[in-house]
């Protein structure tokens, strides 16, 4: 994610220095093995049993939102792993599970914690050795804390990203058989790590999201993918990241059909009272705000009124988020709703690369919004 942030150069430099030192002193490790496939029935049983006896809590209060930025938090978590400060990582994971803190805008810290650990820090283009380093460090964490669910979930997240690295970004017909073997092997390793975590006492909401990422990479059928979502939402109903993961699964270029995401957003949000319903609608529909042709094609069938209400409720309850404002601006611009677009652009500090193709597209949309 290419965003500016206020972390000091020295902190980031120290992180990369630790990475370079570790890579220089460790031998090359090969993680690619052939695994026997775990039956889907076994996996679904683990999914159902994971939340058994779990007490569902009310949504986190807006008062849990902190002014700490996502970028600084992500950097700090990455540095702790590079320093092998596993004790502090355990404390953070426990705090995320019990206190359920949010960033301003409503983003769960727990989600960012595992995102930070799943993707290796690097300079320049990501290399295979970067993933090997990250996996090696997380494996040491697992060894030091064998009862840690956070360590095993982090390992799974790293392997799903490592699978994507093996596949590359080309279309399916450009991926070699060797790349597919690595992709499937690493996704299977991620699943094994999650099944191992399920046998531990600790329960973490991100376990389900990590399993959703496995389901996406293994191409689970819609019935099993939806069953996974339903079990996840039953465990932690306000962890909206589950719904965004499932929305990704439903995109027409993957496993869904045109119109599936707007229909899902309406179905999921309509079962909730306000303001939770419109907020969830905003969370799901905003996954389409990425300036990609298949996603943009889905937007005309969504409710701009409900989307706008959801954005306003998120901002009122959880505070202003530059990312949320960019998503709102993109959808308003797509609908040619000039007043809403103008309002959104007026509050945006920086362009979010996850939303816009680039500065030219962003500036053109902003110029349009600001014309009489």
Which residues does each PLM region occupy?
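N-terminal mature-domain "stem" immediately C-terminal to a signal peptide or N-terminal signal-anchor/transmembrane
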Residues: 37-102
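Short coil/linker segments at helix-helix boundaries
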Residues: 87-147, 157-273, 279-309, 347-372
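Intrinsically disordered, low-complexity segments enriched in Gly and acidic/Ser/Thr residues
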Residues: 289-343
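N-terminal secretory signal peptides that target proteins for export/translocation
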Residues: 1-9
């Amino acid at each position: 994610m290419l965003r500016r942030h206020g972390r000091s150069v020295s902190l980031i430099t120290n992180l990369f220095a630790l990475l370079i030192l570790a890579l220089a002193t460790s031998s090359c490790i090969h993680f690619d093995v052939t695994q026997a496939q775990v039956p889907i029935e076994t996996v679904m049983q683990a999914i159902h049993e994971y939340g058994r006896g779990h007490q569902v809590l009310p949504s986190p209060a807006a008062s849990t939102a902190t002014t700490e930025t996502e970028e600084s938090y992500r950097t700090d978590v990455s540095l702790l792993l590079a320093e092998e400060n596993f004790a502090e990582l355990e404390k953070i994971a426990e705090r995320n599970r019990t206190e359920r803190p949010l960033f301003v805008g409503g983003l769960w810290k727990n989600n960012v914690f595992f995102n930070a650990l799943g993707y290796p820090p690097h300079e320049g283009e990501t290399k295979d050795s970067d993933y090997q380093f990250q996996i090696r460090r997380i494996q040491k964490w697992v060894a030091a804390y064998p009862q840690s669910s956070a360590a095993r979930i982090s390992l799974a997240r790293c392997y799903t990203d490592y699978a994507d690295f093996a596949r590359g970004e080309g279309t399916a017909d450009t991926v070699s058989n060797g790349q597919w073997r690595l992709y499937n092997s690493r996704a299977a390793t991620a699943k094994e790590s999650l099944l191992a975590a399920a046998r531990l006492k600790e329960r973490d909401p991100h376990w389900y999201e990590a399993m959703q990422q496995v389901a996406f990479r293994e191409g689970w059928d819609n019935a099993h993918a939806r069953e996974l979502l339903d079990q996840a939402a039953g465990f932690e109903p306000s962890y909206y990241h589950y719904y965004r993961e499932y929305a990704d699964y439903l995109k027409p270029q993957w496993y869904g059909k045109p119109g599936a995401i707007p229909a899902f957003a309406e179905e999921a949000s309509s079962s909730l009272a306000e303001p939770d319903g419109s907020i969830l609608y905003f969370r799901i529909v905003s996954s389409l705000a990425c300036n990609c042709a298949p996603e943009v094609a889905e937007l005309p069938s969504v409710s701009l009124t409900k989307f706008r209400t959801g954005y306003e409720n998120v901002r009122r309850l959880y505070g202003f988020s530059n990312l949320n404002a960019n998503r709102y601006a993109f959808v308003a611009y797509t609908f040619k709703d000039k007043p809403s677009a103008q309002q959104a652009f007026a509050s945006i500090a920086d362009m979010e690369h996850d939303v816009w193709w680039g500065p030219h597209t962003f500036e053109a949309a902003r110029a349009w919004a600001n014309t009489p």
